[in-house]
Structures are given as structure tokens and as C-alpha cells.
């Protein structure tokens, strides 16, 4: 197993963890519960960092995968920094990463 496959397995693991954390909960729950919201943020950060470590070769080979999904959601209005509100973080944690990455990443490994 190569380095990218290990990274992708970790991303899949983090997405599964997010799925468990957000299951049957809405944005309001996380807005009112800082420790649970921090769990989502932690996993989203780990996924973003892991996505950035995947080699360009793999990213080019699997160009159907949006490797920048987190960066795209986190860009501020000036497109120079990163910020996420509760809604963006919840959306990433509860559905976007599962819908946009999970199956495609499973095809890679």
C-alpha cells in the first residue's frame, strides 16, 4: 500500500466519524453545543490536511474527485483566508464530504 492509499484510508475513516457525530442532529444542536461542534471542526481540519497531502499524481489520475472541497467552502470573500461558519462546517461534516468524497475515495483504494 502506498502513501496516498494510507492517506485516503484515513480520510474515509474521518468521514465515517463525522457521519456518526452528525447523525440525527441539526445545525442548532451544534450551534448550542461547543464541544460537539469542535469534534466536527477537528475532523474537517484533519480531512483538509490529509487532502492536501495526496500527491499531484493521484489527484491528476482521479480528477473526478474534488480534492479542494474544504478549501472551496472555507475561502473568505476576498479569497485570501479561511473562515467557516456553523452552517458551512455542519454541511461539510454532515453531508457534503459523505456525498462528494466518500464513494469516490473508496474507488481509489
Residue ranges and their predicted role:
Residues 1-109:
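Solvent-exposed interaction patches of small proteins and small membrane subunits
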Amino acid at each position: 500500500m502506498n502513501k496516498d492509499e494510507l492517506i485516503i484510508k484515513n480520510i474515509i475513516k474521518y468521514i465515517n466519524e463525522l457521519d456518526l457525530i452528525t447523525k440525527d442532529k441539526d445545525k442548532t444542536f451544534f450551534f448550542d453545543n461547543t464541544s460537539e461542534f469542535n469534534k466536527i471542526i477537528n475532523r474537517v481540519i484533519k480531512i483538509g490536511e490529509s487532502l492536501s497531502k495526496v500527491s499531484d499524481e493521484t489527484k491528476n489520475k482521479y480528477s473526478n474527485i474534488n480534492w479542494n472541497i474544504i478549501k472551496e467552502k472555507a475561502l473568505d470573500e476576498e479569497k485570501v483566508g479561511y473562515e467557516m461558519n456553523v452552517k458551512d462546517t455542519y454541511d461539510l461534516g454532515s453531508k457534503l464530504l459523505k456525498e462528494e468524497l466518500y464513494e469516490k475515495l473508496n474507488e481509489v483504494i
